Amino acid sequence: LEDGAMCVALSSGTSAIMYSLINIMSQGDNFISANQLYGGTYTMFDNILPEYGINAKKVDITNLEAVEESIDEKTRAIFCETITNPGLVVADISALSDIAHSKGIPLIVDATFTTSAIQKSFDYGADIVVYSLTKWMSGHGRVIAGAVIEKGGFEWGNGNFPLFDKPDTSYGGMRWGHDLGDLSNVAYSLRLRTVPLRNLGANMSPDTAFEVMSGLETLALRME
């Protein structure tokens, strides 16, 4: 639905956001975050990630100058929501993408509120899209689920992501940003599937997958 290159389905939107960040960040790193976010995301960024040495630098996402000025050598991504919940602030994804790409970092967009039925964030320059599938995508309120979708083509071996440069001792010395050959287009998703998901285990259950697929059948109609 997003016209992405690869998707990793997870057990919740919260795990999707967490995995999307820790896949490219470690202790001492930071990312730029919108200062208006869904409450659960705000709590994660304020209270959980700092315990692991990862810090969210919150800025007014509509102030593009402030966004750019907040980026430093330890910044690994820009994170925003398509439309904030509940503040209804609309992110200028194209402009944020331009800033991110000028610094060699990705734009991660939480598209839960709009879904791909209203807006395809990749068309505006997003590199990673995350979802809580619990809400509009599923639509029936019967499951909790999430997803991380990669557009494909971002250069993860550009020197800005140490986790993609150093050999992964848990996976035969693989350097995710350099050793994948024809699969380098989806290096981010392959690492997310193999490292955070494999080792932390927030996988989607088969029953949940069935419910989500059933919900997707009526997504476009419901989003009208």
Feature roles, as predicted:
Residues 1:
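Glycine-rich phosphate-binding segment of PLP-dependent enzymes
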Residues 6-224:
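Conserved PLP-enzyme active-site core in the AAT-like
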